[in-house]
Amino acid sequence: MQVILLDKIVHLGNVGDQVNVKSGFARNFLIPQGKAVMATKANIEHFEARRAEIEAKVAAELAAAQARAAQIAALEAVTISSKAGDEGRLFGSITTREIAEAVTAAGVEVAKSEVRLSTGPIRTLGDHEVKFQLHGEVFTALNVIVVAE
């Protein structure tokens, strides 16, 4: 099925590209999410008329994500306190939700879906590097310090 991409899709294409994808992927994911439209003559003409507007919107989203990444990098570290045992293991764990709340409390708005924990939830005290994916192309990292209450 031929579709026109309205957003940059990893491993597929950029804004405005006409790509051939499987029908189910287009019908069940790309089109309902607003990431693509079917490549009919009417849609192609409509897209060409709106191309500059859509590309400006994508560029604005990218610039906003880069600005937030710079703010996160400027924080250097965020401290989270949690109950822990004698050997430095936490009672429970620190998940993406707690990290997102701590960074938001520090002054930078972050959603929990933007936090990437490569090894799963944090279960020990100490310093941990946490990565953030704020946009398809914008990544940053932050040091999270977990201390005992």
Swiss-Prot record:
Record-linked InterPro entries: Ribosomal_bL9 (IPR000244), Ribosomal_bL9/RNase_H1_N (IPR009027), Ribosomal_bL9_bac/chp (IPR020594), Ribosomal_bL9_C (IPR020069), Ribosomal_bL9_C_sf (IPR036791), Ribosomal_bL9_N (IPR020070), Ribosomal_bL9_N_sf (IPR036935)
SUPFAM superfamilies assigned: L9 N-domain-like, Ribosomal protein L9 C-domain
PROSITE patterns: RIBOSOMAL_L9
GO BP term, pick one: translation
GO molecular function annotation: rRNA binding; structural constituent of ribosome
An annotated GO cellular component: ribonucleoprotein complex
Coiled-coil segments: none
Keyword annotations of the record: Ribonucleoprotein, Ribosomal protein, RNA-binding, rRNA-binding
Gene3D superfamilies in alphabetical order: Ribosomal protein L9, C-terminal domain (3.10.430.100), Ribosomal protein L9, N-terminal domain (3.40.5.10)
Signal sequence bounds: none
NCBIfam families: L9
Role: Binds to the 23S rRNA.
Similarity comment text for this entry: Belongs to the bacterial ribosomal protein bL9 family.
Name this protein carries in UniProt: Large ribosomal subunit protein bL9
Name of the gene encoding the protein in the UniProt record: rplI
